[in-house]
């Protein structure tokens, strides 16, 4: 075993970090120690995960995650349509002036209100049930589903809880949901179009947003399976 790889694996941080990566977590610069470990041993750990037919990716924004291939020995996970939509809105908020005004902190209610404002409410209600009529009960169910999506995205490292009052900050890892932007385009406007049009997101060197961890060539974009092992 190469000396530097041995150093990385023997680091006391590595077992927990490895478990988080395998569970689909994104490691951003806010996670100082784990991010530093991945940065210091990126080459060695990339070779390590290749043995599992999995790629250790460092995104242009600086965060790390694992991308399993179709033959990977590491399980793949899929996000629901609502999870992806919430992720796109989080990315929009990350780019917004409101993030600076709020010192980077948002509430579950603010995210929900932004989601309602930016998308077709009828389409959102169909994510609750096809028979949804837009009643107060339907809206309450939708809010609970949005909270569930936020919990999933928190486990993936997209948001960071602030206290116990339903507040959170947004990680740069939400750029996994970012729109492709042509030179000269406004990135926030591009993200807004993406949300309103309900488009799939495909980056030149990134996987499709239909699956944060799936092989892009085999992913079914209509699959609505929830993340394995999460309530």
Curated annotation (Swiss-Prot):
Q: Does the keyword Cell cycle apply?
A: yes
Compartments where found? Cytoplasm, Nucleoid
Q: Which domain of life is it from?
A: Bacteria
What gene is this protein a product of?
A: mukE
The record's subunit annotation is:
Interacts, and probably forms a ternary complex, with MukF and MukB. The complex formation is stimulated by calcium or magnesium.
Region (Disordered) location: 211-231
Which Pfam families does this entry report, sorted A to Z? Answer: MukE (PF04288)
Query: Which keywords accompany this UniProt record?
Result: Cell cycle, Cell division, Chromosome partition, Cytoplasm, DNA condensation
This protein's GO cellular component annotations are: cytoplasm; nucleoid
Compositional bias of type Acidic residues: which residue ranges? 214-231
Family, according to the entry, reads as follows: Belongs to the MukE family.
General function of this protein? Involved in chromosome condensation, segregation and cell cycle progression. May participate in facilitating chromosome segregation by condensation DNA from both sides of a centrally located replisome during cell division. Probably acts via its interaction with MukB and MukF.
What is the designated name of this protein?
Chromosome partition protein MukE
Alphabetical GO biological process terms? cell division; chromosome condensation; chromosome segregation; DNA replication
Quote the InterPro entries the UniProt record gives. Answer: MukE_C, MukE_N, Scp_MukE
